[in-house]
Structures are given as C-alpha cells and as structure tokens.
Amino acid sequence: MKQLTPESRIYVAGHRGLVGSAILRQLQARGYQQLITRTHQELDLLDAVAVERFIREERPDYIFLAAAHVGGIMANQTYRADFIMNNLGIQQNVLTSALRNGVEGLLFLGSSCIYPRLAPQPMREDALLTSPLEYTNEPYAIAKIAGMKMCESMNLQYGTNYLSVMPTNLYGYGDNFDLVNSHVLPAMIRKLHLAGALLRSDLAALRRDVAQRPLEGLTEQSSLEEFTAELARYGITPTSLQLWGTGSALREFMWSDDLAEACITIAERVSFAELYPAGEREIRNTHINIGSGEEVSIRTLATLVAEATHYEGRIEWDSTKPDGTPRKLLDLTRLTSLGYTATTPLAVGIPQLYDWYCQQ
C-alpha cells in the first residue's frame, strides 16, 4: 500500500506542531479514521529503540514525517548544533525504522531553506546543491537535505514510496509565538500585539499574554514598569517596535491548512517513479515544492500584521541584523501539474491567525 488510501493506518509524526496538526485536521476532514499519534512525552523520536518498538507494534501503512526541530533566524544562529543533530536524529530513527518494518508509503516534510542563498528565482527543484546555502540556517538545511536524500535513496534501492515535499514559509493555527525561537510571521504577530498593549499601557492585556505564553523575566504579577524594561530586550518600547534587518527581503507565505491539503493530495496521487524521466540514469531532485505563489517583502508583511493587530506605533528596522536570504519564491510547476493551488491569501490568513491568537 504505497499510496494513501481510506483504508491506510496513518501515523502523523509531530501532530501537535504547526504542520502536523494541520495534516491531522485535514485527514479527519477527509474522513480518514485510522490515525495514529503520539506526543513527545509518549514517544521521543530521538530515542531509536523507542521509535523502532513503536513502528513495529503499530504497523502503520503510511507516515507523515512532520516532526522537526524548527525556529527562526535568531534560533538558527544561536543553536546551530541542536538544529543539525536533532533533525538528523529524528529523520534517521523514523526513516530506518519505517524501512525495516515494511512501511511502504511516507511523506517527508523538508523546508525551502534547502535551496542555495542566491538560487535563481523562482526556485526550481533542480536548484538543490548548485551553490552555497544561507549561512544562518545552514545546519538545519543540511539536515533536511539529508532526510530528503535518504527518502530518495531508499526508494531507488528498496522500492519504497517515500516522497519529499519542500514547503515555503508557513503560518497557521498552533504556531509557535516564542519571541526567540519562532519564525518571522508569528514572532511579528506577538511583537506587534505586545507593542500595541504597551503603547496603550494595557497592563491586563500584557499579563494575559505572558500567562498564556510565558516570557522570561515576566509574570502575571509584573508591573507596567517591569514589562517596559523586559520587552525592550526584544525591541518593543512604549512608542515603537524594532525589527531585524532592512525589511527588504522577499518571502512567500502559505497557510498551514493549505499545505496540509497539498500534502494529502500528493500522498494520495503520486508515486516516486512519476517524479523523474523514464530511463534516467542519475536520479535526483525528486522532491516537490509546495507554496502559495504569493510573495511579499518583510516590510510589507509588517504592515499587514500591524493592520491586523491595530498597532498604531512606529516600526523601525535594525539594519545591523541579518535579513537572511534576499529572496525566496518557489517554482510551483510540479505542484500545479497535480491540480493543486493554495486558497488562503495573507490578507485573509493573518487576521484569522491573530483572532485565534487572541482567543487562546
């Protein structure tokens, strides 16, 4: 059972994360019933023995490998060893256990940061490994490339159907809003939310926020003066918000449930042999880009988030901090050939996510 069917026993690895939770929601919406999940407390994917036992006992037919150690520019810069070691460990354990236990179908979630820093835009799948990576997230990217190559190599040697997809920047329900370790859009939402509360001297809103999402040095009992002092560490002041870089970097963003729909469509319809020309001797770049096709500058993104959060203060840019890759837009030719197109533009998704954020 190499492709996903209604009868498949499906393991969603990382079902509490941004991507995994969206895949689980969409599988349930499509009527899939044999769904297997485990929390990190129930199954540590860095524990090879535990992973082997779990897959041997549960016998899934299909695995969505959405579990990963992820974060934004600051986290990637600071915790370089963690990003490469943990991601390689998760991938090694799940993929090899799946292979040993006869799991024929799997979908591996990579990241568009696998592409070279100066790759021609929009980035085609065959841009992989053609020039140097972006330094800030190089360890994470190398780990993801290794996972993709493991899937590709297992397919070629063992006849499995382990597909790899490379999503663009994602956002959605269940996102990580940590001010240090999150990606650009959720971090921006929280910073502008806090900046707006500080601008209005809304102590109740500030306290509610840290009660729901703890922030080092602050509690539900902290005073306005304490909030002002601590939030300054993140560029948040009573009159302005400072963001990293120049704001000129161009990025593509995709609603996580749109990604999930694309992943399930691929799992249902695609076999590995369709992803390279018949008779090809050197088979590579068999992954599939997944994106929205909607590209904005980080500066424009900040404006959209400010509108959604009703922020009326100043936004300033710290050009001494890195912008990351100058432009990242995926070529979606392979995806659109499957008949899939994303349906949630940023102007709709950002307010939806902010409403969800405020309700938590």
Which residue ranges define each predicted feature?
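C-terminal substrate-binding subdomain of Rossmann-fold SDR/epimerase-dehydratase oxidoreductases
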Residues: A13-L18, A22-R30, L194-Q360
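Active-site segment of SDR-like NAD(P)-dependent oxidoreductases
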Residues: V70-G71, S112-P120, T168-Y171
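Active-site Tyr-X1-5-Lys
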Residues: Y135-T168, V184-R200, A204
